[in-house]
From Swiss-Prot:
Family: Belongs to the herpesviridae pp85 family.
Taxonomic lineage of the native organism: Viruses, Duplodnaviria, Heunggongvirae, Peploviricota, Herviviricetes
Protein name: Phosphoprotein 85
Pfam families recorded: Herpes_pp85
UniProt biased composition (Basic and acidic residues): 600-610
Source organism: Human herpesvirus 6B (strain Z29)
Keywords from the named record: Host cytoplasm, Phosphoprotein, Virion, Virion tegument
Length: 610
């Protein structure tokens, strides 16, 4: 057993009943069938470690992680990445649920010690007998008023113990032999308990039983020395007061660990959501199950902090085990991080590519061909930027238009972009959140037949905001949309679905930036592409002052129909003009041609709209 190596140097035994057939899972947390699945997946030593970490013994979260060693059997190693995260989450949820009930029971039992008027008078007499000096007497109410669940954090506990130890001069205090080693038995059922310097082995035995009953949930009032007999000695009061302060400090630390664990659980769940979506790329049959999971996580994220979260945790955990069982039966190796890496690379290719380029070629191209092998030639170094075509190969992922996850836009994205949702087709999307990477909103939108734009606007409306529309272009001048931020985080970002833009002809085209931020492409049979110079790239040799320019921003509103490209046409015309200063008549002729071109372009735009 795991604990044999620890028993040699101890005077007590770690409880042997921390292992059970249900892996110490409470039936309200995990079903017996799912607990049996854990036992089937893990090797024996790992199963024992999970049972110990999953036991009722209160311990720090970092101690749980040291004990929790998850090792799957070889036949389940293909799904190891998914199984490890789900099993760890299950242990944390079980400890969270058990810990809350445990702390509630401890508080009830400890408060029952002095729930009557007679018991309170007995405590007052004991304290007055211990703190006999006038100087020490002022400490008595400071300690008595701190005996509750929120009264003794570590800092106050240390001060209280020091104050109690100052009373040893009021009686003959001679500790029993080897009392410190003997007192280690108090940690057998509670790893959060801090052991003060007791003086009586008799007291340690009683307090050990008290801690055991408090930990495992026995409905029995704790026993104290000065209340269990008519003859109350000062040494009894001294040890009892140390027990009271140390136990209330332990309860405070238990509550603190439960709060920490709750925060970690919420983060784990949202992180596993991303893993589940990546698994869905490899197992498209899980699409509906993952959408159900996304809806559950979305509901959890919207719960107020003062509400109970365990019902949400229970449903989410059951759905995750459903995914795990399906994944272990599939004849495929589950590699979420591998898939995410290729998705990021695929998106980077989309970001750099032009609309008329073949994505398959971009994903597979390299500077040299390594398809043919020649033993006389040295090995060819493949381009480091090359990636295998794992995303567009339908045989690898069995991705079809009917089951592709990209069609509902619930994957994370690696670049900051701006939001624009047009005709239910997502071109560019960004959602800024605080800490979690849940990808639930797009999934919920798809599940309930809503467009993602409707979901975003609904979220804005709930927070009293208006939705922000931005250009689908990659310009950095667009304003990003920031959804409502709260203590419950939501997706960092969501995958954009690149919508190819179609040109009206095969000839050269010019892109026009309209005031409504929609992009259109128009072609001209004439050599219009000669005039399409970006304005920022021009080096004008004969630039007129801005205030005198007929198309400057300070001109009248009648000139606002001129787009930036039309102004670039005029600048390009001047660039090809001689460097010598032309006459006024020549200048008017040169200025007339760009205006004619601009009018023609405006007419073409109006015709295209009609």
């Amino acid at each position: 057993m795991i604990t044999h190596a620890m028993e040699g140097s101890k005077t007590f035994n770690i409880p042997t009943f921390v292992l059970d057939e249900n892996c110490n899972f409470i039936p309200d947390v995990l079903s017996r069938a799912n607990a049996k699945f854990i036992k089937e997946v893990l090797i024996r030593d790992s199963y024992n470690a999970v049972c110990l970490a999953n036991s009722f013994i209160p311990m720090a979260t970092q101690t749980v992680e040291q004990i929790l060693i998850i090792i799957t059997k070889f036949k389940f190693s293909r799904s190891r990445d998914l199984l490890m995260s789900v099993f760890r989450l299950g242990v944390h949820i079980n400890r969270f649920y058990a810990g809350k009930n445990q702390v509630k029971h401890m508080i009830t039992m400890m408060k029952s010690l002095f729930d009557t008027e007679e018991a309170m008078r007995q405590l007052d007499r004991a304290l007055m007998g211990l703190f006999v000096d006038a100087r020490d007497n002022s400490y008595m109410p400071l300690i008595a008023l701190s005996l509750h669940e929120n009264g003794l954090p570590d800092s106050k506990f240390i001060k209280a113990v020091r104050l109690i130890q100052t009373t040893v001069n009021s009686f003959h205090n001679r500790p029993d032999a080897d009392i410190e080693q003997y007192a280690e038995k108090l940690r057998a059922y509670n790893y959060l308990y801090k052991i003060p310097k007791y003086s009586l082995k008799e007291a340690v035995d009683i307090y050990s039983d008290n801690l055991k009953d408090l930990t495992i949930g026995v409905n029995k009032k704790p026993t104290l020395l000065f209340t269990s007999s008519d003859d109350a000695y000062l040494s009894h009061i001294y040890n009892d007061l140390l027990f009271l302060t140390s136990t209330w400090n332990m309860i405070y630390n238990c509550k603190k660990e439960i709060r920490r664990l709750n925060t970690w659980i919420k983060y784990e769940i949202n992180s596993i959501m991303e893993t589940a979506v990546l698994v869905g790329f490899q197992l498209p049959d899980l699409k509906e199950t993952i959408l159900d999971l996304a809806a559950l996580i979305s509901n959890m994220n919207l719960v107020s902090p003062d509400k109970e979260l365990f019902p949400h945790y229970k449903l989410i955990l059951a759905k995750l085990f459903e995914i795990c069982i399906f994944a272990t039966k599939a004849n495929i190796c589950i590699l979420p991080s591998f898939i995410k890496g290729h998705l990021i690379e695929f998106e980077d290719v989309l970001k750099r590519s032009n609309d008329d380029e073949d994505l398959n070629y971009l994903l597979l191209k390299s500077r040299d061909s390594d398809d043919e092998y020649d033993e006389d030639k040295p090995p060819i170094q493949v381009d480091p930027g090359r990636v295998d075509n794992v995303l567009t190969d339908s045989d690898f992922f069995n991705v079809t238009p009917e089951n592709a996850f990209s069609s509902i836009a619930i994957m994370p994205i690696s670049y900051d972009k701006t939001i624009d949702v047009e005709d239910n087709e997502i071109q560019v999307l960004e959602v800024e959140m605080q800490s979690l990477s849940a990808v639930v909103y797009g999934a919920v939108a798809s599940k309930y037949g809503l467009s993602l734009e409707q979901v975003i606007r609904k979220l804005n409306r709930n927070e009293g905001r208006t939705s922000s529309r931005a250009s689908p272009s990659h310009s950095t001048s667009t304003v990003p949309y920031s959804p409502p931020q709260s203590d419950r985080s939501t997706p960092t970002s969501i995958l954009r679905q690149r919508v190819p833009m179609r040109s009206n002809s095969r000839s050269s085209s010019v892109s026009f930036s309209q005031e409504d931020s929609n992009r259109s492409h128009y072609s001209d049979e004439t050599n219009i592409s000669d005039y399409s110079y970006p304005m920022a790239d021009l080096e004008l040799e004969d630039e007129e002052p801005m205030e005198d320019h007929p198309h400057s921003p300070q001109s009248t509103s009648s000139n606002n129909s001129m787009s930036r490209q039309s102004r670039a046409l005029q600048n390009g015309q001047r660039r090809r003009a001689p460097t010598m200063v032309p006459s006024s008549q020549t200048r008017r002729q040169n200025n007339a041609r760009p205006r004619r071109v601009a009018r023609r372009l405006t007419e073409m735009m109006n015709d295209a709209r009609l």
